[in-house]
């Protein structure tokens, strides 16, 4: 069920929807403690109702939160508000690689640059024991600073 604008999840106030997929809905939200905008991913209820999936989610969230890399979206927080479980992540502005590819192929120089950035990010994650479970163009955000990996399948 979509969250209404103004809904509070702990210190995070929902501002607008950003997207939805099989693993939940993502919203732009305001961190009222730190005064910054963040992305909040609300997880489906069936995920949190299953104890094994909930434990896996919490393990993976802990592992992902340890990743510090310029080309990996930072996980800031996890929380529960009533029966709603959520992740709080860095808000990454830009367009996904999937969106960009609808306008045609990338120049070879961009393919090399973004490919190297994604490979470096994946190497860092793998060295930390974290596997990206949903690597696809829709989970690569292109920003002014380069490529950022999103959504490690949490």
Q: Where would I find each of the regions flagged by the language model?
A:
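Conserved ATP-binding/catalytic core of the eukaryotic-like protein kinase fold
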Residues: 1-154
